[in-house]
Design a protein with these regions (language model features):
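Catalytic domains that recognize anionic headgroups
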Residues: 1-280
Length: 280
């Protein structure tokens, strides 16, 4: 996909202005990666593992876990190489001086983090939820700047429109964050809510609450504490749980659909890209 995007740029080098979205999909399971990339991280001859097991890794052999991590890392390296090709094509065509480049992802993946392999919405974890947003301004504005604003994916569209000087054709759910991140260094919002199947995660500057939509089974973590996700502070701070949960309910316009509430009662966790898939 990245090479096709580079080819498109060459074919449309004189297109002005242009907007191009490139969905590489990788690095994503199944982790089919050329052997030469995988061998940079695991050179052993062992059982192949390209599918995430969605289970506790303490029941998985060290060799399988090592191979899973190697295949994932190999895919990251492969994508890095071909994104470099796309970036070099922009440079060769003289596009970098007037083109905004944004790199992000929709989610991450646990490969042994917190003894789990997979991605899930309950319990939630930062290696799945906390994704990077990298922005290169054509004039180098803000180069090297890092920030920890509470930003969500819908904010990216609003930011693109603002930087391009294009008025939004209709009200947007997102908020432009460029100036907050680079110039003002002010918070964009006081919390974010992420919904995944039958659970929500509400995050503010200090707290991370993961809770089912029926208000049960809360996990509360203090982000200011070392090893924050090793301790569930729900019983110590019930008022924080209630406050954040109510913010999440408000973000859902005050209520959840009955079938989601029913699912929250029935399911112990929420694995996979969607907790809405039927259990076998």
């Amino acid at each position: 996909m990245l090479t096709e995007a580079a080819h498109w740029l060459e074919q449309n080098y004189d297109a002005e202005p242009f907007f191009r979205v490139v969905e590489s999909f990788d690095p994503h399971e199944p982790w089919f990666v050329p052997e030469w990339y995988r061998r940079q991280y695991d050179d052993n001859e062992s059982h192949e593992q390209v599918i995430s097991s969605y289970r506790d890794v303490r029941d998985i052999s060290p060799a399988v876990l090592r191979r899973s991590r190697a295949n994932y890392s190999g895919l990251v390296t492969m994508c890095d190489r071909w994104f470099g090709h796309l970036y070099a094509t922009l440079a060769a065509l003289g596009k970098l001086d007037d083109t905004l480049v944004i790199v992000t992802s929709d989610h991450g993946h646990s490969i042994g983090d917190r003894n789990y392999m997979g991605k899930r919405g309950y319990p939630s974890a930062p290696e799945v939820y906390d994704v990077p947003v990298l922005i290169r301004h054509p004039r180098g504005i803000g180069a090297g700047t890092r920030c920890d604003l509470l930003v969500q994916h819908q904010d990216i569209a609003a930011t693109i429109l603002e930087l391009a000087g294009v008025p939004a054709p209709q009200p947007l759910d997102g908020h432009p964050f460029w100036r907050r991140a680079v110039e003002e260094r002010k918070p964009l919002r006081d919390h974010v809510t992420v919904a995944w199947g039958s659970a929500i995660t509400v995050i503010d500057e200090r707290w991370w609450l993961n809770i089912k939509v029926n208000g049960k089974g809360a996990f509360l973590h203090d982000l200011s504490a070392p090893n924050a996700f090793e301790t569930n502070l729900t019983d110590r701070h019930p008022e924080v749980v209630q406050n954040l949960f109510q913010k999440g309910v408000a973000d859902a316009h005050g209520k959840f659909p009955p079938y989601i509430l029913e699912m929250a009662e029935q399911q112990a966790d929420a694995p996979g890209c969607s907790a809405l898939v039927p259990r076998v």
